[in-house]
Amino acid sequence: MQRSLRHPLTALLSPLGALLLLLPGLARPSPQEPATAPPDKRELEGLIQEYLELGSCAVGPERERQLEIQARLSALPDLSAEEEARWRKELQKAWEKLPGLPAEKGDNWYFEDPRRGRYIVGGKRSKPAGLLIGMHGGGVGSGDAGSIAPLYEGAAARQKWVALFPEVLEKTERGWTDAGTEEWILDLIEQARRSFSVDADRVYLAGHSMGGYGAWTLGAHHADRVAALAPAAGGPTPILDRATGKPTDIDWGVIPSLRNVPMVVYQSRDDPQVPADVNQLAAKQVAEARARWGGYTDFTYWEVDGQGHGLPPGGAEAHFERIRGFVRQARPKEIVWQPVLSWKRQFYWLAWERPAEGALLEARLDREANRISVTRQAGAGRGGGPGLAVYVDAELVDFDRPLEVLLDGQVVFSGQPRRRLEWLLETSTSGDDARRFSARVPLEPQAAR
């Protein structure tokens, strides 16, 4: 699937250009100067635009190009606190100038040739209080955005949310995570935030049946980007006992990563299509995770009887009322992450250039001691591993004192983090200042860097 943000900006950003002049070392190099000379104003402006256009899900040659751009920016000097503050504003302005949704109301096709990527826009489109992604049910050969929109749109409007109802790109059993749909959903979220000026702290995922699976799974994969989740009559992927067919475990990458995300999971015991045992097991595992790691304080399992495969008593409005007050916990002191996506390189303030599938990370921030501790358990998945790091800035830790960073109990960094433009840019692709950081500390011994 081709990525969606491939539209060059039509004009240079004049405020950005003015800021570039303030950076030292930006005179145009002569032909005799080495290739490592800092980029000049015009080149830097173009590099920033190109990087942001490549987006937060870049893979393959697109990610390689982003890394090349970061390498060019590494020739620039460190930033002062004042320069960092100015760059934050200008990078946000640059992100906001990227395209919004192709159409901002009604029933639409995102891709025209061939026609695919159907999405419906509804709810409150003028100054919304939040963004709802409403996820339809279905399976192999079935699934229709038009089936969920009538059930959710009115309830979303009453919460003063703008609502997007996407249709999976391929109608499979796991349509919300197959065939590029997951990346497309993130693009839709970012474009909707630009189109409707939505607060990044108020993005909600909800879905019914397979859409409940989508809310569980995308919500876990991108827990750092959502305020709350409301799956109904659908659960995460179970691992089944071969002899009995009963669920014995939940697929990796879900329960651990949800530590800091509010959820209200709805299930009817008599559901003939999605048996209650999967969500019952998931709720049990959440309780076990809470005992192990803490957190999960706003997880609710709402089980009734007699509703079959329908919505909860009171419909979507009753479900949304239970999540409406939540805002994203954007910078938690404790993080648990079990990565499953090669292109998900940032999770809160953790960074992993090549995340190891199924590995388990626990990270803890001690602000009083100005210390970050990370522990890592190897995963059962394939590949990945290099590039593990933590992002920091002067709001997360105290830049006036030495920062200590530990990996598996061993000190890997002790000193003053450096404010760098390349890290501000790397963490600006989602246009979210709470996920934007000015320093990056590799989780490897300093002598090995």
Locate each region found by the language model.
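Acidic beta-to-alpha connecting loop that harbors the catalytic carboxylate
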Residues: 138, 168, 269-272, 306-308
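A domain-start/cap signature at the N-terminus of enzymes
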Residues: 32-130, 411-413, 418-432, 448-449
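Primarily recognizes the serine-hydrolase "nucleophile elbow" in alpha/beta-hydrolase
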Residues: 140, 201-257
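C-terminal beta-sandwich/jelly-roll accessory domains of carbohydrate-active enzymes
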Residues: 338-449
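C-terminal catalytic histidine-bearing segment of alpha/beta-hydrolase fold enzymes
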Residues: 272, 276-381
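Short substrate-entry loop that stabilizes the transition state in hydrolases
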Residues: 125-175, 238-239
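Short beta-strand/loop motif that positions the catalytic acidic residue
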Residues: 258, 264-267, 271
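Alpha/beta-hydrolase active-site loop
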Residues: 176-197
